[in-house]
Amino acid sequence: MGELAKTNAPSYGGRDRRRHKVFMTRNTEYHFRDGLCVAVRDRRTGEWLPGHLALRRQLFGSIRFFMNGALLPTPGEPKIGEALFFGEGGRDLITSPLESVERPPKDLVAEYPS
């Protein structure tokens, strides 16, 4: 199982050209290429989840949770503590809160299921 690289690199003022990104929740890794979810993996076992509802879908945005129990849908890229929200291309899917956003190493990208 390859190590994931944190995206907390020094600031870069230009356009982000990286194609791959991994959104990490408590139990699951959501792997994206060019904004499309291409692989989902169980964090505990490292097993790919070929039937996951997020596969082949784009993020619609995120859901922000408030202490009073309120939820707020937010467009754009999710922030730490917000849930990923897949709202188009199938049933609505809301994940557990985001713990980190990372960049997958090349060897892990090569393992993505077809």
What are these regions (language model features)?
Residues G2-A9:
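Charged, amphipathic alpha-helical segments
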Residues M24-C37:
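Short, solvent-exposed loop/hinge segments that bridge or flank secondary-structure elements
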Residues G46-S114:
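Low-complexity intrinsically disordered segments
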Residues K21, C37-R41, G81-F85:
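Short polybasic amphipathic segments
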Residues R15-V22:
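Short, hydrophobic/aromatic-rich segments at coil-to-beta transitions
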Residues N8, L36-A39, R44-G46:
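An extracellular/secretory-lumen and virion-surface interaction module
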